[in-house]
Amino acid sequence: MIIEVRAKNCYAFEDDITFSMKADMRNKKFGANVHKENNFNVLKTVGIYGPNNAGKTCLIKCIRAIRNVLLNKKNGLMPNIFTDSDVCELGVTFMASGRKFSYDFKYDAEKEEYIYESFSEIFKYKYNNEKEVCWLKKDTVSEIYECIDESVQTMISVVSKNNLLCYVVDTSKFEHINEMKQILVGFAEKIDIINMNNIPMQHTIELMKNKNQLQQKVVGFIKNADLYMDNFEYVDMDRIQLKTGEGVEKPDEKVLDIPENIMDQIRLVSTYKGVHVPSMMFDSTGTKKIAAIASYVIEALEQGRILVVDELDSSIHFKLTRAIVAMFNNELNTSAQMIFTVHDINLMDCKRMFRKEQIWFVHKDEDGVYVYSLADFTAQQGVRDTTDVMEKYRKGALGALPDPELINSLLSIKGGVKGDDANAK
């Protein structure tokens, strides 16, 4: 599970930002929303709010970059366009098998080199104090090289910088570096990242092809979403009923269209009053998105995965988004985690759904981009457990709110008045 993400000079983030999923155990409210293991307390869900183009998606890009780096894939990292530095800095603290680890790296995007990386294990002891034990530190700028495997330490300075250390040495020969690689790769492989505006149906299709318990749970999820649907199946073509002239058409939504697998899409059918119809052609965009996300949600809950969702509320009714989040917050969920961006303030509910530290904001102004939690606001600032957070956010008291002036556009279109002239009047 992710405990903390750190970034500097990455995408929209020029200065240091820290996104934390550490639970504040002074707050006893909604204890089921917290995963507790070996005296570590981690939030099961976090929702991120903010205006368009503020940096919410950039935060998800940082998580994706961390995952891709750890899996030896193209990282896609870009330094902030307003800085002179080419060095992107990223870090993550996470739990794996009941242990807490921290990993940080610096990547020179111009030279395509990893100029710094460090890996540590964090132990908790008396009075909740923590102790960090360094397994690896490679700082090519300051020429500091440390490794728990002494035989590795002598070679760190001469190995290539075009990749992480665990991918440029034969880790099978070194006990701790090999374990480090397994921990990092195992963590990264558990992260699924999806965008609800461009979510692939193929993941659900592949699960629907296999008649097993996981497939049955995906179908149950879709049916329980209250879509007036009798069943949802992957069937043979002869069971699909099409009216004359309809033929095999592509779905309207390009975001859900997979041309090379169009027949797979057609065989994914919904049943209404005993009639089988191709879901991709007949169902609403929202229904298709629910079907697409169903496989990710079920797999996350079944296998203890980390599901990161951009624009969770896209084309989905607010009651369904609440229900999906509630599945992860439930006490029956013992290992899965969900991080999501959202605009729907109906989810901003600290009275019935969330702890304060589960609601985060991304705010942008002329000076930069800021990432902060609702828990950063004190009672003296007017935010208490009994506060109507939705109303506070509507009024702009929490920041991270757009301030559109579209009336100027209307006046310029309909009245022949330019925006600046309209303001002057």
Placement of each model-derived feature along the sequence:
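Short alpha-helix of the ABC ATPase nucleotide-binding domain corresponding to the H-loop/switch region
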Residues: 317-322
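C-terminal lobe/lid and adjacent interdomain/linker elements of RecA-like ASCE P-loop ATPase modules
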Residues: 1-4, 303, 323-425
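Conserved P-loop NTP-binding catalytic core
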Residues: 39-47, 51, 60-112
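Pre-Walker A-like glycine/lysine-rich segment at the N-terminus of P-loop NTPase domains
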Residues: 1-65
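Extended helical coiled-coil dimerization/tether regions that scaffold
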Residues: 8, 199-282, 402-403, 408-425
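P-loop NTPase motor core
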Residues: 84-148, 362, 374-387, 391
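Conserved ABC ATPase signature
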Residues: 45-50, 249-298, 306, 312-316
